[in-house]
Amino acid sequence: MIVGLRGTIIRLEPMYAEIDVGGVIYGMQMSLNATSMLQTKIDSQPDAPVKIICAQIIREDAHLLFGFCEEIEKQTFERLIKISGVGPKVAIAILSTYTPTHFAKIIADKDIEALKKVPGIGVKGAAKIMVDIAGFFAQLLQSQEESIAPSNNLKYEASLALQSLGFKRNEIQKVLEHIEALSVSEIVKEALKRLA
């Protein structure tokens, strides 16, 4: 089973990438968000190898490879395809429309209208996804809370604010460890200085 690849991107399209790993070229489907992140990495370091997290689906008629830049996106994809009626195509469409963090907020807010904006999802499908994936995000949020010292609500709220701005959770945690608890806005301002 292929769980990750490190190599050179030789072709990058909006929802598809090819990576050369020691002379073997792998093609994979990716979300628009993932290919955008990958393009940013390539633009900043054109000759540096990239690492792509993978999910592999083997069927009678095809071996499919899906690529992700973040573990949370892969976990969300794998959870989505376990829902009856949601295949890889719809899961990638969801992750192309919304980042995992934004998608989690949609689920928490029970915003069926936002979910219906994803190509291939109707009212019934949106309702089913809402019910079936709610527990997944509840567990995910709980594990995030535990890893960011839940006793400190200010830092937790600051972490959520910084995540909504697109910063990665592990980067945020490192910075927040060195900031004294003031107010949420002061923590966010100080963290932004250090993350920039």
Swiss-Prot record:
Residues 149-157 are annotated as: Flexible linker. It comes from the Bacteria. It is found in: Cytoplasm. InterPro entries: DNA_helicase_Holl-junc_RuvA_I, Hlx-hairpin-Hlx_DNA-bd_motif, NA-bd_OB-fold, RuvA, RuvA_2-like, RuvA_C, RuvA_C_sf. Residues 1-69 are annotated as: Domain I. Residues 157-196 are annotated as: Domain III. SUPFAM superfamilies: DNA helicase RuvA subunit, C-terminal domain (SSF46929), Nucleic acid-binding proteins (SSF50249), RuvA domain 2-like (SSF47781). GO terms for molecular function: ATP binding; four-way junction DNA binding; four-way junction helicase activity. Keywords: Cytoplasm, DNA damage, DNA recombination, DNA repair, DNA-binding. GO terms for biological process: DNA recombination; DNA repair. Signal peptide: none annotated. Residues 70-148 are annotated as: Domain II. Its main location: cytoplasm. GO terms for cellular component: cytoplasm; Holliday junction helicase complex; Holliday junction resolvase complex. The keyword DNA damage applies. NCBIfam families: ruvA. Has three domains with a flexible linker between the domains II and III and assumes an 'L' shape. Domain III is highly mobile and contacts RuvB. The RuvA-RuvB-RuvC complex processes Holliday junction (HJ) DNA during genetic recombination and DNA repair, while the RuvA-RuvB complex plays an important role in the rescue of blocked DNA replication forks via replication fork reversal (RFR). RuvA specifically binds to HJ cruciform DNA, conferring on it an open structure. The RuvB hexamer acts as an ATP-dependent pump, pulling dsDNA into and through the RuvAB complex. HJ branch migration allows RuvC to scan DNA until it finds its consensus sequence, where it cleaves and resolves the cruciform DNA. This is Holliday junction branch migration complex subunit RuvA. It comes from Helicobacter hepaticus (strain ATCC 51449 / 3B1).
